[in-house]
Amino acid sequence: MTDNNKYRDVEIRAPRGNKLTAKSWLTEAPLRMLMNNLDPQVAENPKELVVYGGIGRAARNWECYDKIVETLTRLEDDETLLVQSGKPVGVFKTHSNAPRVLIANSNLVPHWANWEHFNELDAKGLAMYGQMTAGSWIYIGSQGIVQGTYETFVEAGRQHYNGSLKGKWVLTAGLGGMGGAQPLAATLAGACSLNIECQQSRIDFRLETRYVDEQATDLDDALARIAKYTAEGKAISIALHGNAAEILPELVKRGVRPDMVTDQTSAHDPLNGYLPAGWTWEQYRDRAQTDPAAVVKAAKQSMAVHVKAMLDFQKQGIPTFDYGNNIRQMAKEEGVANAFDFPGFVPAYIRPLFCRGVGPFRWAALSGDAEDIYKTDAKVKELIPDDAHLHRWLDMARERISFQGLPARICWVGLGLRAKLGLAFNEMVRSGELSAPVVIGRDHLDSGSVSSPNRETEAMRDGSDAVSDWPLLNALLNTAGGATWVSLHHGGGVGMGFSQHSGMVIVCDGTDEAAERIARVLTNDPGTGVMRHADAGYQIAIDCAKEQGLDLPMITG
């Protein structure tokens, strides 16, 4: 048994520069990215190992964290560390092209895959919720979801408002690690936004990092600001301290009409992530310890009220969509039979991108030098010269996005381009243009790496929403291809029982061997997304598979 102490009063910051603390960059990289996940600029509650998303942790407890760090510093380049739900459980001899770390987080046999059983295991120190990029050590702060949210808002603007969100406003809630991206994404897309958040500390953090522009004093003040800025055609984001389950019904009652409605509260985790209406945060946390069943019930009842208000907006013809936190499922379990009347964001706006393997490609500069990221930004523009939309994103990102922890960048690119960029970055390390290696990873929210019937795989054309072979195959292929670390998780985004997903990270250290691994992994990884969607019958994916020369025996053979 290990010490299940999850609190330590300490500040962690990844090493910078090009001096190694481990034996090679292949082990230095996961070490730095683990530490970066717990940087106070990055993590929501680093002293309790919580990175984002309710209780998404980087390690099971502090004893496990210490042992992971110790093991990574001694790991050889023909050894692989196995991490089981945030606990380092073994080091085995493999080979130099194998992953240096293999991670499995939060996985439960399906019959027991629910929050009640997971919470029992967590309390005993036998499990850890890894979310998606918390336990896989590739979280880069809210930037990691900004572009995906931006792409969603832009596509919604195309579909509903003739391509322009000028003078429009988005109503949403949640300013945590994921939801905190919403105000900036809306601003970049040209819209105002009203962002409800129940924790003042989260509002303060988003103001400090320039993800949100202003805070209103109360609802009347917020609506007055929205009216002023939309009339002026300005894109300003406004935070409001309050509870969405109280404020959304009040807006419906007043006849207020937003132009778009969504939500990114941590509704996936009623015990830890959604404050019941009428409760203080302190009451919520205290009662979670003493009467968890009552807390879950109260949170889900409030979610039902919240979703009913969203349905009311939808009935008025206002574009309304779930942004992947499973709030519709929670409301349905509380008796809101038509909770799924409004769609999720993936089938509504994102799936055509997934069909081409396009998703959240990200990289981080292990040097800690922002100039390394700016140089890679320029390289992306050079190699993809004709994509004005992507260039605009990179320009806006440089101007508006504050780095959190190690400098990083995200841009949505797909099959073909990911490998091209990865190989170019590796050459930049080789030539000394970059001052230290970079790591390339992605969110588990990607085209071929997740099965989540209420989010990424909602309403698949062939009805295969719940088939979870695909992320397993993705993880196996990335392991075979030589990713530096590979992860396989359960329950990220939408909570226990509702998703399985995999992640990969690969190091660009400037070597020939790295180039070979990069070419394989950054082709195969998005390739599985095209494969998955082609198999489901999407013509865009079938065409992409043929154009890119994928060997899909039942489709291209």
UniProtKB/Swiss-Prot annotation:
Pathway named in the protein's UniProt entry: Amino-acid degradation; L-histidine degradation into L-glutamate; N-formimidoyl-L-glutamate from L-histidine: step 2/3
Matches recorded under InterPro entries: Urocanase, Urocanase-like, Urocanase_C, Urocanase_central_sf, Urocanase_CS, Urocanase_N, Urocanase_Rossmann-like, Urocanase_sf
Cofactor detail note: Binds 1 NAD(+) per subunit.
GO molecular function: urocanate hydratase activity
EC number: 4.2.1.49
A cellular component annotation (GO) from this entry: cytoplasm
Names of the cofactor(s): NAD(+)
SUPFAM superfamilies per the UniProt record, alphabetical: Urocanase
EC top class, as a word: lyase
A Pfam family: Urocanase_C
Compartments where located: Cytoplasm
Major location (coarse): cytoplasm
Any single biological process term in GO: L-histidine catabolic process to glutamate and formamide
Keywords assigned by UniProt, alphabetized: Cytoplasm, Histidine metabolism, Lyase, NAD
Residues noted as binding NAD(+) in the record, renumbered to the chain: 53-54, 131, 177-179, 197, 202, 243-244, 264-268, 274-275, 323, 493
Reaction catalysed by this enzyme: 4-imidazolone-5-propanoate = trans-urocanate + H2O
Record's function text: Catalyzes the conversion of urocanate to 4-imidazolone-5-propionate.
Family: Belongs to the urocanase family.
Name the UniProt record assigns to this protein: Urocanate hydratase
Organism per entry: Pseudomonas entomophila (strain L48)
